Amino acid sequence: MATQGFSCLLLSVSEIDLSMKRQYKQIR
């Protein structure tokens, strides 16, 4: 259970990082 939640959290963080990078590229 704990590991599943951790992996889910990691996945969401990586998704946020990707979206942030996309926005950064769009701004520039």
Curated annotation (Swiss-Prot):
InterPro entries: Humanin (IPR028139). Disulfide bonds: none annotated. It comes from Homo sapiens. It holds the Pfam family Humanin. GO terms for molecular function: receptor antagonist activity. Plays a role as a neuroprotective and antiapoptotic factor. The keyword Transferase does not apply. One of its GO terms (biological process) is negative regulation of execution phase of apoptosis. Highly expressed in testis. Also expressed in kidney, heart, skeletal muscles and brain. Signal peptide: none annotated. Keywords: Cytoplasm, Secreted. Induction: Expression is not affected following staurosporine (STS) treatment. Down-regulated 6 hours following beta-carotene treatment, remains down-regulated 24 hours following beta-carotene treatment. This is Humanin-like 4. One of its GO terms (cellular component) is extracellular region. The keyword Cytoplasm applies. Belongs to the humanin family. It is found in: Secreted; Cytoplasm.
